[in-house]
Swiss-Prot record:
Its main location: membrane. Its EC number is 2.7.13.3, 3.1.3.-. It comes from Staphylococcus aureus (strain MRSA252). One of its GO terms (molecular function) is ATP binding. This is Sensor histidine kinase/phosphatase LytS. The chain crosses the membrane at residues 6-28, 40-62, 88-110, 123-140, 155-172, 184-206. Keywords: ATP-binding, Cell membrane, Hydrolase, Kinase, Membrane, Nucleotide-binding, Phosphoprotein, Transferase, Transmembrane, Transmembrane helix, Two-component regulatory system. The keyword Ligase does not apply. SMART domains: GAF (SM00065), HATPase_c (SM00387). Autophosphorylated on His-390. The modification Phosphohistidine is found at H390. Pfam families: 5TM-5TMR_LYT, HATPase_c, His_kinase. It is a multi-pass membrane protein. It catalyses: ATP + protein L-histidine = ADP + protein N-phospho-L-histidine. The lineage of its organism: Bacteria, Bacillati, Bacillota, Bacilli, Bacillales.
Amino acid sequence: MLSLTMLLLERVGLIIILAYVLMNIPYFKNLMNRRRTWKARWQLCIIFSLFALMSNLTGIVIDHQHSLSGSVYFRLDDDVSLANTRVLTIGVAGLVGGPFVGLFVGVISGIFRVYMGGADAQVYLISSIFIGIIAGYFGLQAQRRKRYPSIAKSAMIGIVMEMIQMLSILTFSHDKAYAVDLISLIALPMIIVNSVGTAIFMSIIISTLKQEEQMKAVQTHDVLQLMNQTLPYFKEGLNRESAQQIAMIIKNLMKVSAVAITSKNEILSHVGAGSDHHIPTNEILTSLSKDVLKSGKLKEVHTKEEIGCSHPNCPLRAAIVIPLEMHGSIVGTLKMYFTNPNDLTFVERQLAEGLANIFSSQIELGEAETQSKLLKDAEIKSLQAQVSPHFFFNSINTISALVRINSEKARELLLELSYFFRANLQGSKQHTITLDKELSQVRAYLSLEQARYPGRFNININVEDKYRNVLVPPFLIQILVENAIKHAFTNRKQGNDIDVSVIKETATHVRIIVQDNGQGISKDKMHLLGETSVESESGTGSALENLNLRLKGLFGKSAALQFESTSSGTTFWCVLPYERQEEE
């Protein structure tokens, strides 16, 4: 009996080793988490059927004289029996996969056992089916609670399964005397070994999945902490100052040697090893980063040569580089470096991928918030500059004066003033409006200004109908026209022309132009215009700065406000995508 126990322990040990190996394969771990899906059930059927077949093939042959022999057997003599770990594999299949998997594995294992032959081989087909169904029932109960049977319960179920096996041998064997003799030899070793094996098998599954859950919990905590600490900086946009703070936070919270963030063209920040030559404001040094920016796909490398840094003393030996996206376009990279290649594991890769997705979302949210603030600022500045009490009362006084002279004209101006107020308020709630709406708002504004200063300036709007649904930021043309009226024609009472036009730039873009014949912009202010606030006698220039930021934020740097200025006048223009709002 002791010899049989030791031989069975060897077989169980083999099963346990294979179980441990499987549970350290990510695909199999994911399979265990999806065990209630039919696809996963069929895969579990195949895996546990292979376990069951191996249990049959590596069984211990017992003859009538109780002689034991262990090898790999495909066929057995008619007068011998087989002690094996088949019950363990069928039982675990049912506990993990439920009745379907347990029954399937039981049938496959039983049919193969009948094929192998031996004394009363049909008994083991019957017992295998019973064991699969009963183990599957206990597995189903655990599945409904979204759990696995406990280790102690698994051991008890293993004992019950072996007792069913012994009862089947006693009930269905033709030679009762031989059945009793066989049971007296194998019952205790098989009950002990297979129940312990079942408990160990289930403990490996439970502990591995629990360890993964704990790891995910730690990762989730780290990611949430990173999100909370980095979000305020992402709201500022991806610049050198914010990137430096973000890189420092990641370096402090993660086990990495260095962290770098780049834009599409330059290093924005580098914290940690290699910071002596990976210097912010420099062009991107590594070919690895350039490849990621070009392909838009994550890359992981484990050698200095693959990183592609040309500095001879660079300590960086492994890296993972993740693209950062905004609205589907690559805007930069997040790079994590390691001085020891062994520190870059599957866990770091998963965490890096998750961070890249989160950071890309934060960049988009930050940009959306920036646009919202800019739009609100545009509304406030527009209302302050154009709907100020001074503007309002001047318009009302003009209309009042016209009531006595030209009541129809006064009525028209009152409607224009009403429309102007309404359009300003509506524009403040949208990121883009149609060019047609923008021009209507401009016409309302011009009607009021021309009523106050008759004949002082001429406005020519030359826009083809096919462009009237092009989407533009609110106040785009209004700000440029107002800028010309306020600054271009100082002390000039007549001959002041402003031209507004839209022309085709490319098949997918249009150029929007506002041109005046004023005195031009002084050279000391030209390089500042649109980039920062410019103080003047009649304003700060912040409206143009705000407009330029909104254009670049909505459409990219290629849409930035551009201008040319001479003593004969100034031309402002921007190039926007030919995006049209469909007419209802």
